[in-house]
Amino acid sequence: MSDLLVQDELVVDKKEIQGSFAPLGMTASEVDAEDEDETPFDKLREECGVMAIHGHPDAARMTYWGLYALQHRGQESAGIASADGQQVNDIKGMGLVSEIFTDDVLEKLPGHIAIGHTRYSTTGDSALLNAQPISVESTRGLIAIAHNGNLINLGTAKERLERDGAIFQTTSDSEIIIQLIAHSAKNTLIDCIADALTQVQGAFSIVMMTRNRIFAARDPHGFRPLAMGRIEGKDGAPDTFCFASETCAFDLLHA
């Protein structure tokens, strides 16, 4: 599992900061192979795009520009969730980023942190319920996730969660991860996330948020890209940190 680094209210993947590294003991084809016992989940392809912003007064708009630059990674649906430390708001829709997020819509997403997702079209059903970010209320508060990748042990993980009382609202494998976090017996949220990621197999990059924190992680072999950028604060303001599936998302943000 990827190491997670906690810094103030920002949680990042330490191995991503250190740079990419070679896969150990697995090939890309093995990671992308489907589990024989897998249920008919809606598969999220590696082309999906994820974006996260931490520490900007207009985080949703910054996330919008990042997703706009990542539009080539997915044209089926897009979504943004933002938070101001007290409340999380999210808006999702079918279509292109620019079609969904007009200026009026972005004004409904206040806050200094945000995550976003743009989804690649699949051969399965195209439905708004599978658009991301996905949010779940848990005993540790609201958690929202945007995920890019392919998990190969969905069937067994889902069956175990359902035996423990989990109720699934989507057919997205991303909900497996967020349910594993919500059902973890660990004491702190960061430990719950680490615990959940040890239980999934495959290739993934993930950005998550609560009402006041951002988390980012990727699979231990680095099969799915996740880059980290920084926007220098002006006039004494703190720096803004951002995460994206590709560094092209940072260009419009001057990161």
Where are these regions (language model features)?
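Conserved short alpha-helical segments that host acidic/polar catalytic motifs at enzyme active sites
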Residues: 2-255
